[in-house]
């Protein structure tokens, strides 16, 4: 079976790529952040490839207070399949996702999204990827890992540091750090958390892709 795994950023996929390097039938696409980038990247791939399954993967912000850092959560919108039972067996939890147009950076914003949508987690690409797959009749499953919980603020407003295409402007990031050097410790801690989250995601993906 051939599987396409979609990640917005290389950092989200780094541990999994070590496991999946050069494995036949396993494809990885880095879409960039946001719906438009995701749709464009997936359409481009599917123009010349026909995978049996598409997984939309990466980080998600927690909206449900019960979700912890490193929890792997999933949503199966297609008819039930073997993948769903594999995800349960791998320790992943079913969840409802909200696909946002901006990064939820504060506790207050996450609380508001939770109240308005009833979602357990927030991310920025999966709705677009599911829509493209639905057009082609390709099963698609969202598999994400909680990288920041409902009870924590992010150290910076990353929306203000984005380019018009929603990808991070590293020049703006450097300037933001230079203006607020006190944020460096929190940013280092965030990097540790996201690295841990990526490892947890890779462990689950390993079980469902290669079992």
Where are the regions that the model predicts?
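Glycine-rich phosphate- or other oxyanion-binding loops that anchor nucleotides, phosphorylated ligands
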Residues: 3, 7, 14-211
């Amino acid at each position: 079976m051939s599987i396409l795994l979609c990640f917005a950023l290389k950092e989200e996929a780094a541990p999994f790529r070590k496991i999946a390097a050069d494995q036949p039938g396993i494809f990885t696409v880095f879409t960039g952040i946001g719906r438009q980038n995701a749709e464009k990247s997936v359409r481009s791939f599917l123009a010349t490839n026909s995978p049996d399954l598409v997984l939309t993967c990466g980080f998600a912000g927690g909206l449900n207070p019960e979700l912890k850092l490193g929890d792997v959560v999933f949503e199966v919108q297609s008819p039930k399949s073997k993948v769903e039972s594999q995800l349960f067996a791998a320790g992943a939890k079913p969840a409802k996702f909200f696909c946002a147009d901006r990064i939820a950076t504060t506790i207050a914003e996450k609380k508001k999204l939770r109240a308005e949508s009833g979602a357990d987690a927030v991310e920025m690409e999966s709705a677009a990827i599911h829509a493209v797959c639905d057009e082609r009749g390709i099963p698609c499953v969202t598999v994400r890992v909680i990288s920041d919980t409902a009870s924590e603020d992010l150290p910076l407003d990353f929306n203000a540091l984005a380019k018009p295409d929603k990808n991070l402007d590293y020049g703006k990031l450097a300037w933001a750090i230079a203006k607020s050097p006190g944020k460096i410790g929190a940013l280092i801690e965030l990097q540790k958390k996201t690295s841990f989250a990526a490892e947890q995601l890779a462990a689950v993906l390993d079980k469902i892709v290669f079992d």
